[in-house]
A protein has these predicted regions:
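Donor nucleotide-sugar binding loop of glycosyltransferases
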Residues: 13-16, 44, 104
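Hydrophobic helical membrane-anchoring modules
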Residues: 3-4, 15-23, 55, 183-236
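A conserved acidic beta->alpha catalytic loop
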Residues: 41-50, 101-102
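Short beta-strand/loop segment that forms part of the nucleotide-sugar
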Residues: 33-44, 64-66
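Short acidic donor-binding loop at the edge of a beta-strand
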Residues: 86-93
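Acceptor/aglycone-binding surface of glycosyltransferases and processive sugar-polymer synthases
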Residues: 66-68, 72-83, 96, 102-179, ...
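Short, acidic, metal-binding catalytic loop of nucleotide-sugar glycosyltransferases
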Residues: 22-34
């Protein structure tokens, strides 16, 4: 059975992470999956804590502690770079997901099945339902439509995805991934497969979305496509 690396960025969300890890462990045991798990601690204010224990399905578990808070996108970029340089993770395709429970862990099974049957550079999980406030949904829709208007690209997914290990170099040789991981996928990889999954509620706590974070996210995404936007502006 092929071994996969699961990459989980986390900032203070240790309670939710622990519940997610328990579900991942159950899925691994049920399907006889083999996982390495890398948790990226984005300089949390609370001491990292988890009850997960290694077993025949969870072969390796590591917490990568960052010395300063980088935000989830840069934390993911740093972690992918770490995987690229560390021989323990060589040739292990990477499953990236958020740690708060909104990414449904049962979808991991669908990602792995598609990875076996379909040739892809990456498999992304498109959200079929968002549980954020109306104002967020409206502004996010505006963001997506403006992005499509200026670039011709649609991004209907977040971090939840499966990335082929051999395609890491395609992402790391440009700065896109440090701005926005989903946008970097669209801008640098050719064979992108898609599956759909309902976005769940957080296991506990309130959503951290706010206007500033949405604006910051939108700015990062647009920065990835700046050359396309520049060309569009000249000719249209």
């Amino acid at each position: 059975m092929k071994v996969y690396t699961i990459l989980l960025p986390v900032y203070n969300d240790w309670k939710n992470l622990d519940k997610l890890l328990s579900k991942i462990s159950y899925i691994a045991k049920k399907n006889n999956f083999k996982f390495y798990i890398l948790v990226v601690n984005d300089c949390s204010k609370f001491k990292p804590k988890t009850n997960l224990k290694k077993n025949k399905n969870i072969i390796k578990f590591k917490i990568l502690n960052l010395s300063q808070n980088m935000g989830s996108q840069r934390a993911i970029a740093l972690a992918i770079n770490h995987l690229k340089k560390n021989s323990d993770y060589k040739n292990k395709d990477i499953i990236i997901m958020d740690a708060d429970g909104q990414d449904d862990p049962s979808t991991i099974t669908d990602l792995i099945k598609m990875n076996i049957t379909k040739v892809s550079d990456a498999i992304v999980v498109e959200r079929t339902n968002r549980r954020e406030p109306f104002w967020f949904k409206f502004l996010y829709l505006v963001h997506k439509n403006v992005l499509f208007l200026f670039t011709g690209n649609q991004i209907r997914f977040g971090n939840f995805s499966l990335l082929k290990f051999k395609k890491i170099k395609n992402l790391m040789h440009k700065s896109d991934i440090w701005a926005a991981y989903p946008a970097a996928i669209v801008n640098n990889l050719n064979k992108i497969s898609r599956i759909k999954s309902e976005r769940k509620r957080r296991y506990s706590g309130n959503s951290k979305v706010n206007l500033y974070k949405l604006f910051n996210h939108s700015s990062r995404v647009f920065s990835v496509f700046k050359y396309k936007i520049f060309i569009f502006s000249i000719f249209y």
